[in-house]
């Protein structure tokens, strides 16, 4: 899978430990200062993916629906987060699967003592960082290239998730080269990026109008859309910088 965001743009020579990890369809890049923190992320992915698979086996409709979904109160944590995010955006729960797995993995890393932790799950990124991190935006064939966003040091987890109609195999009904959403609720950022990307058609007016999909949701800090030669931003967007965005850095299946 090609994903529109790469957290290793402008990668310094002394970059912390980075590991590519695959568990069935889940393919992530994990970055941390300590191998124990990476192992914590991998174990969390194993646990929560297993819980999700068990739930889907009991109700296959969960995986198929593109509409809001109701789950029992005793559903696994991963399922409840996905349902809440999808319902908030008026779409199906699988729209939040990658961001939710990323968030749960980083939460486990923090419990293990990490102050610097990044999990990139196909362009849906959860992170906590005690130093600046540049997230590079990959927007396929768009003429807008080498664009990065600076995430300043912070002591709590945040997320940046992306959707694209022109890049990668994920379901999108729009024409965005990249639609990114910023939120401390990483599950919501993932579902919202899907909803935002669905609204993007070709042209400047469509880019401007697409942000209606995410306005009015307090937990969403900001959003960015790239379509062809056009770029639009709404709300609080991290500082823009130039980044060396290389296709080979992208976490993909």
Swiss-Prot record:
SUPFAM superfamilies: ApbE-like. Belongs to the UPF0280 family. This is UPF0280 protein Mbar_A3697. It comes from Methanosarcina barkeri (strain Fusaro / DSM 804).
């Amino acid at each position: 899978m090609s994903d529109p965001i790469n957290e290793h743009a402008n990668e310094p020579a002394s970059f912390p430990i980075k590991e590519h990890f695959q568990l069935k369809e889940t393919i992530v890049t994990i970055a941390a200062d300590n191998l124990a923190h990476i192992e914590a992320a991998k174990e969390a992915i194993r646990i929560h993916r297993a819980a999700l698979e068990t739930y889907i086996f009991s109700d296959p409709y969960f995986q198929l629906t593109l509409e809001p979904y109701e789950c029992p109160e005793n559903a696994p944590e991963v399922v409840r987060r996905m349902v809440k995010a999808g319902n908030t955006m008026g779409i199906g729960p699988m729209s939040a699967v990658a961001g939710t797995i990323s968030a749960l993995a980083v939460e486990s890393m923090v419990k293990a003592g990490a102050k610097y932790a990044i999990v990139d799950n196909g362009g849906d990124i959860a992170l906590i960082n005690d130093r600046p991190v540049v997230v590079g935006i990959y927007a396929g064939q768009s003429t807008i290239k080498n664009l990065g966003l600076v995430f300043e040091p912070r002591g709590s987890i945040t997320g940046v998730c992306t959707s694209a109609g022109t890049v990668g195999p994920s379901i999108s009904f729009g024409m965005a080269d990249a639609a990114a959403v910023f939120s401390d609720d990483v599950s919501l950022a993932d579902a919202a990026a899907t909803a935002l990307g669905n609204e993007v058609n070709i042209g400047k007016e469509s880019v401007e109008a697409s942000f209606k999909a995410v306005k009015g949701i307090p937990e969403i800090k900001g959003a960015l859309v790239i379509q062809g030669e056009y770029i639009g931003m709404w709300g609080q967007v991290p500082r823009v910088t130039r980044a060396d965005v290389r296709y080979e850095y992208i976490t993909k299946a």
